[in-house]
Amino acid sequence: MDDYAVLSDTELAAVLRQYNIPHGPILGSTRKLYEKKIFEYETQRRRLSPPSSSSSSFSYRFSDLDSASVDSDMYDLPKKEDALLYQSKDYNDDYYEESYLTTRTYGEPESVGMSKSFRRPGTSLVDADDTFHHQVRDDIFSSSEEEGKDRERPIYGRDSAYQSIAEYRPISNVSRSSLGLSYYPRSSTSSVSSSSSSPSSWLTRRAIRPEKQAPTAALGQDRQVPLWGQLLLFLAFATFLLFVYYSIQAQEGNPFWMDP
């Protein structure tokens, strides 16, 4: 700590910049704090540095700090040389190099598998792309074959249209138990001449028509008079009947009633 008291404010600021220690203006109240930070930094570096290079690499000449032109040469910290020294001598101390991107420990060999792990997804993406193209081709071929089959099919009448719609519609429990079928029969060439009296067309029409009549029933329910309106109409009608009854009774009970 006494070595730093000899330094001027400019020299102390140069040391702080060289050590990458954030600082402000050096005043009488802040000088002791900056000297303490420099002392702690150098103590940590001596503890983490190898014993052989502690006297050579980290020796600083504080007596030759008169000229400001040689500040960078006097306080040069060989960070790259320290890294090479740690890698050559295989030191496993917890010495970290902090940067804005990564934090890496010196002395640990760089993993070669990282490049492989980044290359593998590329091959997997290529394989996935190939399989996707094959699936698209298969879908195109299958769709073209289905279109060809649809063109070969004959044009059905109205009854067959009901059957084609109903082949995806399950029969109700009553009709399934009576007919012993799980689904409606599929349309085929034998059903071209089917008439309206066939059971399949009758069942399909019966299954489709209630769905069409459901909106009309809902509209009819919406148009009905609400309950409170019905009660008001009933009370008005009862009042009218009572008025008629009392008027008749008054005419019959009056003996002096004379017809005009």
Curated annotation (Swiss-Prot):
It is found in: Nucleus inner membrane; Nucleus outer membrane. GO terms for molecular function: actin binding; beta-tubulin binding. It comes from the Eukaryota. Residues 1-45 form the LEM domain. The modification Phosphoserine is found at S8, S29, S49, S54, S69, S72, S88, S99, S142, S143, S144, S172, S175, S177. The chain crosses the membrane at residues 225-245. Residues 184-206 are annotated as: Disordered. Residues 46-224 are annotated as: Interaction with F-actin. The modification Phosphotyrosine is found at Y162. Residues 187-201 have a biased composition (Low complexity). SUPFAM superfamilies: LEM domain. Stabilizes and promotes the formation of a nuclear actin cortical network. Stimulates actin polymerization in vitro by binding and stabilizing the pointed end of growing filaments. Inhibits beta-catenin activity by preventing its accumulation in the nucleus. Acts by influencing the nuclear accumulation of beta-catenin through a CRM1-dependent export pathway. Links centrosomes to the nuclear envelope via a microtubule association. Required for proper localization of non-farnesylated prelamin-A/C. Together with NEMP1, contributes to nuclear envelope stiffness in germ cells. Interacts with lamins A and C, BANF1, GMCL, BCLAF1 and YTHDC1/YT521. Interacts with TMEM43; the interaction retains emerin in the inner nuclear membrane. Interacts with ACTB, SPTAN1, F-actin, CTNNB1 and beta-tubulin. Interacts with SUN1 and SUN2. Interacts with TMEM201. Interacts with NEMP1. This is Emerin.
